Amino acid sequence: MIRTNFLLKQARRHESKDKSSKRHKSEEHNDKEHSSDKGRERLNSSENGEDRHKRKERKSSRGRSHSRSRSRERRHRSRSRERKKSRSRSRDRKKSRSRSRDRKKSRSRSRDRKRRIRTRSRSRSRHRHRTRSRSRSRSRSRDRKKRIEKPRRFSRSLSRTPSPPPFRGRNTAMDAQEALARRLERAKKLQEQREKEMVEKQKQQEMAAAAAATGGSVLNVAALLASGTQVTPQIAMAAQMAALQAKALAETGIAVPSYYNPAAVNPMKFAEQEKKRKMLWQGKKEGDKSQSAEIWEKLNFGNKDQNVKFRKLMGIKSEDEAGCSSVDEESYKTLKQQEEVFRNLDAQYEMARSQTHTQRGMGLGFTSSMRGMDTV
């Protein structure tokens, strides 16, 4: 195996030397061709220069008739130069293309050789005899592992992707999970402590409110101080509000309901509002009638239809004729006067209506026709 590897290495070296010598030869040949092309161009240019000089001397003796021929010659020369330049450029391009092709072919050949060598070495290693000692097989397997690992390391260094950090006995992901679990446990403990404190405060407030509702708020606060419990400003405020509620209840007889916040409701104002509500919504008694109500009930317009309409509009219940007959003399006189007044008003209304509808062109109404109103 070692001998075959050594022979393969020597064969690769000879091939690389042959390739380099071939490349140098091809480059020298191309340089020579390029220099020869340049020399030819220089000779052509020098010859063209001499020809030009001679032609100028000849043409100086000639007249203006040959000016057109000169311009044609110049055009022909410029075209020939351009053609030569384009030819030289095309040659250079062809040479560069041929070089690139040669390189590609050499690369493909070297790849094919490498593949063949690998396949041969694999086939030989597969078909080896199995009767050799275990120590030799182990040493060979170690050598193979080393050879396989070397190009892999080289390829990893060439690759752009960063390699993962080596394992040094501690896993960072597991450490992060453990830290998170510890934080969660601490947060749970803190939350439980806060809940306990809140429950204790609520109990203290309820005790203080209950003690204040009984009436002896100051005594209860003193008792709490004597017992050693801490009296917070909230407890003191609740006791004060309970004392105010007890005072309002004693004066007005109206207590503030439990669903109201005692710190936000004034008990005296609440009692006044409740009194007003009761007066508004309580039912009227039968015997209580004011004088104005009696006058409106006994009002008479001199016409039964008008009386019925008025009572319906005002919400007055109709009384019996027997009740109406039993009336005092004073009330009877007032009713008579009301009837006369309403009759006069009706007559005046009819007169005004007839004048406004029939005599429109009589001015603003302050004429002799309005004198009849006084006589009525």
Curated annotation (Swiss-Prot):
Family label: Belongs to the RSRC2 family.
Sequence positions bearing Phosphoserine: 45, 318
Cross-linked residues, Glycyl lysine isopeptide (Lys-Gly) (interchain with G-Cter in SUMO1): 317
Ranges annotated as biased composition (Basic and acidic residues): 13-52
Location in chain, cross-link Glycyl lysine isopeptide (Lys-Gly) (interchain with G-Cter in SUMO2): 317
Coiled coil: 171-214
Protein name: Arginine/serine-rich coiled-coil protein 2
Region (Disordered) location: 1-171
Keywords on record: Coiled coil, Isopeptide bond, Phosphoprotein, Ubl conjugation
Disulfide bonds: none
InterPro entries membership: SMAP_dom
Biased composition range(s): Basic residues: 53-155
